[in-house]
């Protein structure tokens, strides 16, 4: 007896309207996406991309935003990284939604690089989304800072395009925030990750 299988149901990517993004944010608790007026400015000055099911149900979304935008998060990043070197660049705000964002982050990272045209690309992650760090490191980002942004809890700040030095890394458990912060303060960046005993460890390199 020959069994037939349905073709795999692929997820689609498309740019979202303000209404679609705001609807998805109704279940989002991150203070990065507050107040509502800030979210509307994000959609106006940047691009919001969504991951959709074949039924067109919206599963996840992520904004791609210019560094020079009149946004609280952009201003906090400029203060964190310094304006020189990131002018004209773009950054990824945290993804939202219940869907695994791997496909979405790959697409938005590529879009940010395209828009930046050789200038700096950054990304921000909420402290509660630490499980996504290996995903970003796999997309060529490096963890460069762990600090508050716009009165938020300490956020992960990542930059793209950091070359991996030819030396052995210092492995730091992600859960040890004090040790991680000390390594970052000494000029190290996390460029690699691995799992040990169900924990995430970051490979830190001097950059």
Q: What do these predicted ranges mean?
A:
Residues 1-59, 167-173:
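Short amphipathic alpha-helix that is part of the acyltransferase structural core
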Residues 38-50, 54-60, 65-71, 186-191, ...:
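A short helix-loop-beta-strand connector motif used in the catalytic cores of GNAT acetyltransferases and
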Residues 57-96:
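Conserved acyl-donor/pantetheine-binding loop and adjacent beta-alpha core of acyl/acetyltransferases
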Residues 88, 93-114, 138:
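Conserved acetyl-CoA-binding loop-helix of GNAT-fold acetyltransferases
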Residues 112-127:
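Conserved GNAT acetyl-CoA-binding A-motif
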Residues 127-146:
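Conserved active-site alpha-helix within GNAT-family acetyltransferase domains
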Residues 149-173, 199-207:
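C-terminal "cap" of GNAT-fold acetyltransferases
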Residues 178-186:
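Disulfide-braced loops of extracellular cysteine-rich modules
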């Amino acid at each position: 007896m020959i069994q037939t299988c349905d073709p795999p149901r692929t997820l689609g990517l498309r740019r979202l309207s303000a209404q679609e993004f705001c609807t998805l944010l109704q279940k989002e608790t991150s203070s990065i996406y507050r107040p509502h007026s800030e979210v509307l400015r994000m959609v106006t000055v940047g691009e919001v991309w969504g991951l959709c099911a074949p039924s067109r149900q919206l599963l996840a979304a992520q904004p791609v935003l210019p560094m020079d935008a009149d946004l609280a998060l952009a201003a906090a990043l400029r203060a964190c990284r310094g304006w020189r070197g990131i002018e004209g660049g773009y950054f990824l705000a945290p993804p939202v939604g219940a869907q695994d964002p791997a496909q979405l982050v790959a697409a938005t990272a590529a879009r940010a690089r395209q828009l930046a045209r050789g200038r700096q690309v950054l990304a921000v992650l909420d402290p509660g989304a630490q499980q996504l760090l290996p995903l970003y490191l796999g997309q060529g980002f490096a963890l460069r800072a762990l600090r508050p942004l716009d009165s938020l809890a300490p956020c992960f700040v990542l930059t793209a395009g950091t070359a991996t030095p030819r030396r052995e890394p210092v492995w730091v458990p992600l859960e040890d925030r004090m040790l991680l912060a000390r390594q970052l303060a000494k000029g190290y960046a996390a460029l690699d990750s691995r799992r040990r005993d169900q924990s995430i460890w970051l490979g830190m390199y001097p950059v």
